[in-house]
Amino acid sequence: MMRKLAVLVLAVAMVAACGGGVVGVAGAGCNAGQLTVCTGAIAGGARPTAACCSSLRAQQGCFCQFAKDPRYGRYVNSPNARKAVSSCGIALPTCH
């Protein structure tokens, strides 16, 4: 699991570096690559860092888009991701 997550984080960073991590016009400003600072929290359930919480807040409006994206959905919807969001005091949106 940790190896898969490490590969995903690397892939997200590479996609983001190439501009592919930015979601279309409706999601202008959405960049999954900014969430790589949350790897420890999402991968191992560690307490999220201040940088992670800041990135989660900045991308909060994008959570549903990330959850629906096949590249990120299973990680965004994971129990550890939900725990990290909650630990940062961020409300989880209801996605439709």
Curated annotation (Swiss-Prot):
Q: What disulfide bonds does the UniProt entry report for this chain?
A: 30-62, 38-52, 53-88, 64-95
Q: Signal peptide: which range, if any?
A: 1-27
Molecular function per GO: lipid binding
Q: In the UniProt record, does the keyword Secreted occur?
A: no
Keyword Ubl conjugation assigned to the entry: answer is no
List the InterPro entries hit by this protein, alphabetically.
Bifun_inhib/LTP/seed_sf, Bifunc_inhib/LTP/seed_store, nsLTP2
Keyword terms, alphabetized? Disulfide bond, Lipid-binding, Signal, Transport
Give the GO biological process terms: lipid transport
Q: What does this protein do?
A: Transfer lipids across membranes. May play a role in plant defense or in the biosynthesis of cuticle layers.
Q: Which family does it belong to?
A: Belongs to the plant LTP family. B11E subfamily.
Please state what the protein is called.
Answer: Non-specific lipid-transfer protein 2
Gene this protein is translated from: LTP-2
